[in-house]
């Protein structure tokens, strides 16, 4: 054993000094991150929790948000899994792995629904906060910039707020990790030497809660 350690022999896969960031760069186009989100809703008998699923692809930072529900049963989750797989196919994306935490809402039937699409489930190991850092950061900003500022009174109300933020994030909001392009953009914007104030177009969502500025088309 001492000889093996002295010679630094390695068994199995070759190990190096790669970090988790290096690993994500290798598998960023096939490793999806998944998490449940809850949002209180005012009902006749008081506050109840609505739940929905957020799935994010680290390679492009593109995300997907499911409709909300009061009951996250296997039938509901199975439908959401099929929906996101269909959308991924339309965008020529290949979710080979879905990494999730050990939340009890992820039942065996949920895993079966995901695996039926051809993807494999990877569960969080204990005390590993960085394994799904991208999706958790998105959920944090979703709550801080949108959901925490809205009093939800119906499921359609919750869906509208979440999906407006989803559209803003995927198609409008610049992302530093993508050279300040939104996750849904595949090509950079046309470069201009100067931009006049009259060329800037302002738009908003949710009554001005989400703001967006862009250059008008030439």
Give names to the regions the model predicted.
Residues 1-218:
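Charged DNA-binding/catalytic regions of mobile-element recombinases
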